[in-house]
Amino acid sequence: MEARSQLRHRPTHREAQELGFERSVEPYFRWNVRDSQTRPGDIVLCRGCNNLVRIAIVSDIHGNRTAFEAVLADLRQSSPDLILHGGDLADGGSSPREIVDRIRDLGWQGVLGNTDEMLARPESLTEFASQTPQLKPLWAVIEEMAAASREALGEERLAWLGKLPRAQMHGPVALVHASPDSPWRCPMPEASDVGLEAVYGPVGRSIAVHGHIHRSYIRSVAGMVVANSGSVSLSYDGDRRAAYFLLDDLQPSIRRVEYDVDKELKALAGCGFPHADWIARILASGRYQAP
């Protein structure tokens, strides 16, 4: 593990209280500040620092508790100053309820993913599916999975998901799930520079990060960085490991984390959710598979 080139003083609990900070249940992961300029729960730049040294973005967990716990262990080593989630928290895995509860306990700020939206607002899937009627069998499978996830989550968790914002802005970083205009559509890694700039240039930050497509990349485009964080679960790039984005002193990278895929496959087999066999095939191969 490479050493951090700049280290900031992490305040003691007493110092933090005197400055108006609240310590999270996971002291590695969050410092919140309360003052007249922030809303409850906002995460801000550390007081006394001009910039965050390290920012991590963890996206597309998809209810995969085994992969998520492995990523948390890696985050304890990389020790970011701020962690954001990129949405798609619950649907598509063995543990939707446990993932939502864990994210809330950690206090991570994040953005609305398309599967979060379809769980909280079922009509959003109908609206999007109507644009691609040729994929009607796929949308039917996804709706059956979503119905089971909604039942597992319950109304209160669904309401929380539905209130997630569509974007987060922190220092030089803008985070969206797919694109600034939609959590459902975004360019692919092979998109042209012009295409990426057209979508992400309007965010007005030097670094734009998104999730959604489960294929990580980092591109330099028109004086800014556009990156995909990769996915904690259901990788589509042939690498079964979990992935997340790390910005270290403005140097972006993708972290890959080994986890016990077989353990998660067993959890899927026993969860009772519809089409768990489909999800298992994607997890086992690290590539998208048709239902």
Residue spans of the language-model regions?
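Core catalytic region of metal-dependent phosphoesterases/phosphodiesterases
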Residues: 54-149
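Acidic, His/Gly-rich catalytic cores of divalent-metal-dependent hydrolytic chemistry
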Residues: 219-291
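Active-site environment of divalent metal-dependent phosphoester hydrolases
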Residues: 62-67, 91-94, 115-121, 181-183, ...
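Active-site-proximal segments of metal-dependent phosphoesterases and phosphodiesterases across multiple
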Residues: 51, 130-139, 173-203
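Active-site-proximal beta-strand elements of phosphoester/diester hydrolases
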Residues: 54-62, 172-179, 226-230
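Short, positively charged low-complexity motifs
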Residues: 4-5, 20, 24
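Active-site metal-binding loops of divalent metal-dependent hydrolases
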Residues: 59-61, 87-89, 108, 114-117, ...
